[in-house]
């Protein structure tokens, strides 16, 4: 059975030759070179992923939603009752939440995964529960390092198993009351930003309570002293089980050479952790939408990512990742279905990158 160290060691590099061939093919399609903008770059990125066998393609699609509760909820950083995590997880099994509707529209299966819900087990939910909620990061670590490592490995294996069954495009999502607080703490640590710059309203926290949330994030960092150069240390000290789970999806998909669509702010924090743990993960990550949460711009700048969609969304759950799946499929359709200039009797001047 593969260890976490072995999994990280075996993440493949992108296939540069396949990417060069893809770029050459795209430049010869029935359009001025570069005129489809970032769709062309996305197709080239996909072509370089070894799990796609040298060509942009989408087989089965899966949304992995990590559900967990957080001890820091006790600090008054969220307006929703903690039980909402369990209620919404149950609603996900019925297909009635935002991510479920959008994933169904995109033709993706939603995997609802309990990595730490503070409630009795929920029928229809995948059980990877570590504990009934993580620790309160304002007074101590979220979890032990061994718990974080074990969950990373379990989720990575689950992701790779899905790849073996035909999934070639993953999306990540989360569900957990108060989870924007640990996400903000992680972004603060990884980017070196003050909590004031990255703490937002989450699920409609009143403005009068923002200062408390900022103070909680600062206390969490001061008490736990996470090492920004050690992604697992940051996850275990100021993260949460859902954030660890999303990180595990990214590690597992990268190990299989397959793409992962990020969602919003919560997933940005997990992506920062994943890239710190294994920089080789970065080429497999695809940003979906620009989260309306305050710290989004800072996190994305640190990841050097520009999302494809600007929808003023901050629901979470993986909703933005599901919404962006058709964009990935559009890049593949462009690559495979457009005609070629050579067969059309059209000759374009060299360097013409503008549509006529």
Swiss-Prot record:
> Which InterPro entries has this protein been placed in?
Nict_dMeBzImd_PRibTrfase, Nict_dMeBzImd_PRibTrfase_bact, Nict_dMeBzImd_PRibTrfase_N, Nict_dMeBzImd_PRibTrfase_sf
An example of a GO molecular function for this protein is: nicotinate-nucleotide-dimethylbenzimidazole phosphoribosyltransferase activity
Q: Where is the active site?
A: 317 (proton acceptor)
**What is one process in the GO biological process aspect for this record?**
cobalamin biosynthetic process
Substrates-to-products reaction catalysed: 5,6-dimethylbenzimidazole + nicotinate beta-D-ribonucleotide = alpha-ribazole 5'-phosphate + nicotinate + H(+)
Gene of this entry: cobT
- SUPFAM superfamilies listed in its UniProt record: Nicotinate mononucleotide:5,6-dimethylbenzimidazole phosphoribosyltransferase (CobT)
In what pathway does it function? Answer: Nucleoside biosynthesis; alpha-ribazole biosynthesis; alpha-ribazole from 5,6-dimethylbenzimidazole: step 1/2
Gene3D superfamilies registered for this protein in UniProt: 1.10.1610.10, 3.40.50.10210
Q: What EC class is this?
A: transferase
Source organism per entry reads Salmonella schwarzengrund (strain CVM19633)
Which proteins does it associate with, and in what oligomeric form?
Answer: Homodimer.
Q: What is its EC number?
A: 2.4.2.21
Q: Does the keyword Magnesium apply?
A: no
User: Would you identify the family this protein belongs to, as annotated?
Assistant: Belongs to the CobT family.
Keywords linked to the UniProt accession: Cobalamin biosynthesis, Glycosyltransferase, Transferase
Name used for this protein in its record:
Nicotinate-nucleotide--dimethylbenzimidazole phosphoribosyltransferase
Sum up the protein's function in the record's words. Catalyzes the synthesis of alpha-ribazole-5'-phosphate from nicotinate mononucleotide (NAMN) and 5,6-dimethylbenzimidazole (DMB).
Q: Does the keyword Glycosyltransferase apply?
A: yes
């Amino acid at each position: 059975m593969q260890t976490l160290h072995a999994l990280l060691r075996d993440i493949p590099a992108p296939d540069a030759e396949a990417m060069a061939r893809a770029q050459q093919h795209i430049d010869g399609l029935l359009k001025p070179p570069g005129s489809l903008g970032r769709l062309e770059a996305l197709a080239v990125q996909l072509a370089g992923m070894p799990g796609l066998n040298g060509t942009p393609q989408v087989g089965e699609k899966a949304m992995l939603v990590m559900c967990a509760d957080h001890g820091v909820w006790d600090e008054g950083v969220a307006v929703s009752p903690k039980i909402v995590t369990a209620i919404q997880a149950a609603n996900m099994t019925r297909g009635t939440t935002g991510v479920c509707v959008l994933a169904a529209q995109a033709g993706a299966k939603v995997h609802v995964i309990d990595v730490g819900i503070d409630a009795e087990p929920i029928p229809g939910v995948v059980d990877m529960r570590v504990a009934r909620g993580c620790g309160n990061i304002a007074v101590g670590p979220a979890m032990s390092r061994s718990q974080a490592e074990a969950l990373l490995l379990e989720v990575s294996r689950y992701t790779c198993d899905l790849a073996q069954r035909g999934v070639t495009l993953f999306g990540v999502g989360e569900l957990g009351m108060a989870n924007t607080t640990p996400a903000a703490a992680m972004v603060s640590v990884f980017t070196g930003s003050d909590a004031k710059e990255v703490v937002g309203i989450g699920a409609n926290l009143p403005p009068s309570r923002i200062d408390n949330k900022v103070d909680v994030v600062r206390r969490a960092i001061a008490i736990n002293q996470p090492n920004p150069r050690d992604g697992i240390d940051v996850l275990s000290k100021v993260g949460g089980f859902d954030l660890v789970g999303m990180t595990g999806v990214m590690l597992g998909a990268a190990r299989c050479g397959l793409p992962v669509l990020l969602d919003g702010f919560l997933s940005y924090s997990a992506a920062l952790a994943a890239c710190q743990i294994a920089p080789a993960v970065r080429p497999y990550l695809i940003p979906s939408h620009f989260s309306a949460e305050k710290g989004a711009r800072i996190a994305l700048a640190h990841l050097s990512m520009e999302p494809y969609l600007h929808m003023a969304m901050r629901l979470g759950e993986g909703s933005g990742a599901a919404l962006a799946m058709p964009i990935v499929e559009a890049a593949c359709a462009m690559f495979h279905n457009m005609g070629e200039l050579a067969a059309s009797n059209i000759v374009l001047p060299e360097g013409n990158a503008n549509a006529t």
